[in-house]
């Protein structure tokens, strides 16, 4: 899957209610800046906080990107005024233990531990935790890290049943996330050098 495909890739897990309305307002702005919306959540934290998670198409994000998005979406939110109370706008990266909201997230983080919940029973459960071992167009397979008596060690979870999913912080995840960030920075530096030569 290329970065061009990633920007148009739909999210598997989307907001509801007011969060959904806010996402509909800001997502076109974020996509127009070559970023992807990960999640919107209005929380009762420090008064009222509107948390917006976004990332570049390659999955990276830095403070400058957060500032750019905040500057771009703030006036749009002021005009549309979806929240009828004062709130703090917080734009951030999804972080290392990120929410998994697109199929490409599962492909990218294959081999890492995910915790997820389904909207219906899958293999007589709704909550799962384990290492992602396979991903296809219809779902992903995890190897459970705690197998109950009578359960198979591996379970395939259809994307259509997914209600929530996030990576679990491990040493391997930190190592791979730092490696991916270093690679993204090197590619950005190479692109800047190529642009300067032209």
From Swiss-Prot:
Keywords: Cytoplasm, Ribosome biogenesis
Compartment annotation: Cytoplasm
InterPro entries (alphabetical): Ribosome_maturation_RimP, RimP_C, RimP_C_sf, RimP_N, RimP_N_sf
A GO cellular component entry from the record: cytosol
Pfam families per the UniProt record, alphabetical: DUF150_C, RimP_N
BP GO annotations: ribosomal small subunit assembly; translation
Major site of localization recorded for this protein: cytoplasm
Keyword Metal-binding part of the UniProt annotation: no
Family: Belongs to the RimP family.
Function: Required for maturation of 30S ribosomal subunits.
PANTHER family per the UniProt record, alphabetical: RIBOSOME MATURATION FACTOR RIMP (PTHR33867:SF1)
Protein name: Ribosome maturation factor RimP
Lineage of origin: Bacteria, Pseudomonadati, Pseudomonadota, Alphaproteobacteria, Hyphomicrobiales
Encoding gene per record: rimP
